[in-house]
Amino acid sequence: MAARVGLLQTIGKLQSSFLYRAWPKHSINAKQLARQLSSYHDIKSSNLLIEKTNKPKPKPDPNTLVFGKEFTDHALILKWSDEDGWDNPQIIPYGNLSLPPAASALHYGLECFEGMKAYRGDDGKIRMFRPLMNMKRMNNSAARACLPTFNSGEMVECIRKLIHLEREWVPHSNTCSLYIRPTMIGTQASLGVNKANSAMLFVILSPVGPYFRTGTFNPVALLADPQYVRAWPGGVGDCKMGGNYAPTILAQQNAERQGLQQVLWLFGEDHQITEVGTMNMFMFWINENGEKELVTPPLNGLILPGVTRDSLLALAKRWGEFKVTERTFNMQDVLMATEENRMLEMFGSGTACVVCPINRIFYQGKNIMIPTMENLNVTKRVYDELTGIQYGRQEGPKDWIVMVD
């Protein structure tokens, strides 16, 4: 490996020299070029170092779990610098991070994160659900924030090894799971608004129960208030960044004060439907042409490209029983469908909640009642089939599951 890297660095120096002579205004640093030519500076799961805690915590009772309050004994940490690339990944005891007060993540939001889960099946085996898709999405978010990217497959393997170490933390329950939170932050100590020259990628694990206080598969009510906007064209609505979430908390509090669980985010003068709080949005209805249709907003930059969303679309298309469409629809469509008894079901989807029925939308002073719980044909079916795959009760596409054990 050392000889290979040395050769690549030599090639890098020669090419850098040539590029500087040919295009002096666009010269490339030799180390950067050598790193591009070699995977040596990328994440390598085979170099993972493990330091085990000497103070393991007791495991919580699955019946008492809420979302995101308990954390396992260890964390995965990877550091990156512009000069050296990725350091060796490390699993260390869970604890506080050390950051300079001027770290760019603290001031300018140079940060992105992901959310995925591991499940303990009825057979006792532990499965990760579509982690490669999550890591590819994280790379997209990182690139948008000028944070470093990484080899998605190698990162999945590092996470798999972390979960294997923490396997006793995966709840023995078919309603609970182990939530996986990878996060990348810019750590450069500078008050200038610039690309970070150093970063940290860490992964923490949390055994979780239902996301909503209403429990598993109980319906939620939504506030649709057009005065608040979550995303806009050319923005970062399709990236998983902390800056997309902090501005939503005020609207969420307004919803809760009115006895509503989530915010339905609208966009544009025609009040297009985009997302539901932490979920993608689905509507099952009889459309204007008299067809049964499952419709969800398109990936136009205004919504997060959800892994659960993609999975539900694939399942529904595989059934081949009704029309499945990704297209724009708005609140007027919802109002007309409910008035004409064409509305059948609405639900949200996401890693945290899986599938969540919607039974009411409060919009412009009016309650719009959604008959999801009276029908449940599609909502319950996609929930049962998806969780069946996640917990190993039924077969799904082969590339959806990564076994931990």
From Swiss-Prot:
<dbReference type="GO" id="GO:0009099">
    <property type="term" value="P:L-valine biosynthetic process"/>
</dbReference>
<comment type="similarity">
    <text>Belongs to the class-IV pyridoxal-phosphate-dependent aminotransferase family.</text>
</comment>
<comment type="subunit">
    <text>Homodimer.</text>
</comment>
<dbReference type="GO" id="GO:0005739">
    <property type="term" value="C:mitochondrion"/>
</dbReference>
<dbReference type="InterPro" id="IPR036038">
    <property type="entry name" value="Aminotransferase-like"/>
</dbReference>
<keyword id="KW-0663">Pyridoxal phosphate</keyword>
<keyword id="KW-0032">Aminotransferase</keyword>
<dbReference type="GO" id="GO:0004084">
    <property type="term" value="F:branched-chain-amino-acid transaminase activity"/>
</dbReference>
<keyword id="KW-0028">Amino-acid biosynthesis</keyword>
<dbReference type="GO" id="GO:0009098">
    <property type="term" value="P:L-leucine biosynthetic process"/>
</dbReference>
<feature type="modified residue" description="N6-(pyridoxal phosphate)lysine">
    <location>
        <position position="240"/>
    </location>
</feature>
<keyword id="KW-0100">Branched-chain amino acid biosynthesis</keyword>
<dbReference type="InterPro" id="IPR033939">
    <property type="entry name" value="BCAT_family"/>
</dbReference>
<dbReference type="GO" id="GO:0052655">
    <property type="term" value="F:L-valine-2-oxoglutarate transaminase activity"/>
</dbReference>
<dbReference type="InterPro" id="IPR005786">
    <property type="entry name" value="B_amino_transII"/>
</dbReference>
<comment type="function">
    <text>Catalyzes the first reaction in the catabolism of the essential branched chain amino acids leucine, isoleucine, and valine.</text>
</comment>
<dbReference type="InterPro" id="IPR001544">
    <property type="entry name" value="Aminotrans_IV"/>
</dbReference>
<dbReference type="GO" id="GO:0052654">
    <property type="term" value="F:L-leucine-2-oxoglutarate transaminase activity"/>
</dbReference>
<protein>
    <recommendedName>
        <fullName>Branched-chain-amino-acid aminotransferase</fullName>
        <ecNumber>2.6.1.42</ecNumber>
    </recommendedName>
</protein>
<dbReference type="Pfam" id="PF01063">
    <property type="entry name" value="Aminotran_4"/>
</dbReference>
<dbReference type="InterPro" id="IPR018300">
    <property type="entry name" value="Aminotrans_IV_CS"/>
</dbReference>
<keyword id="KW-0808">Transferase</keyword>
<dbReference type="InterPro" id="IPR043131">
    <property type="entry name" value="BCAT-like_N"/>
</dbReference>
<dbReference type="InterPro" id="IPR043132">
    <property type="entry name" value="BCAT-like_C"/>
</dbReference>
<dbReference type="GO" id="GO:0052656">
    <property type="term" value="F:L-isoleucine-2-oxoglutarate transaminase activity"/>
</dbReference>
